Amino acid sequence: MSTESAMFLAPIPTTDAVPPVIERLVEQHQAAWVDQDSIDDWLAGGGDCVLFIAGDPVRFPECVDVAVVLPELQRVFFNGFRIGVAKREREHEDVLANRFGTQRRPSLVFLRDGAYVSVIAGMRDWDEYVREVRRALAMPTSRPPSIGIPVISAAAGGSCH
């Protein structure tokens, strides 16, 4: 095997460590740690919520920037939403991301009274974040995006008529 092809087989570096700025969301900004076992209880608190799915900070370093901006966005909107942080273990993040139809990290999943509203994926400029959050807080709830497999009835005919 050549050295060039071996480079492509090297594992992608990751870390299980939680960056301090993400820990501060829970310790100083009243965010809650959330996983697949606690999400329904957290959502039962009602109102507007933002679930932060950070991803691995080595693979997705912008998650640290989003963690810094999130409490500032909360303040701009007069604490108009609660913050949940997906537990850092990948299996927790993946289950929550799949449930709410987001595959990109980091993601801010907007929920209202337990139902999906919208998602903002990746880091944005401040003005764009403010616009997108304002839009999300005004949107009605909807179904989370799916993986794109069409749902059809077994009894459906071959045409649309």
From Swiss-Prot:
Keyword Cell membrane attached: no
Cross-referenced InterPro entries: NiFe-hyd_mat_HyaE, Thioredoxin-like_sf
Top-level taxon: Bacteria
SUPFAM superfamilies associated with the record: Thioredoxin-like (SSF52833)
Pfam family, one: HyaE
Keywords: Plasmid
Family listed: Belongs to the HupG/HyaE family.
Protein name in UniProt: Hydrogenase expression/formation protein HoxO
Lineage summary: Bacteria, Pseudomonadati, Pseudomonadota, Betaproteobacteria, Burkholderiales
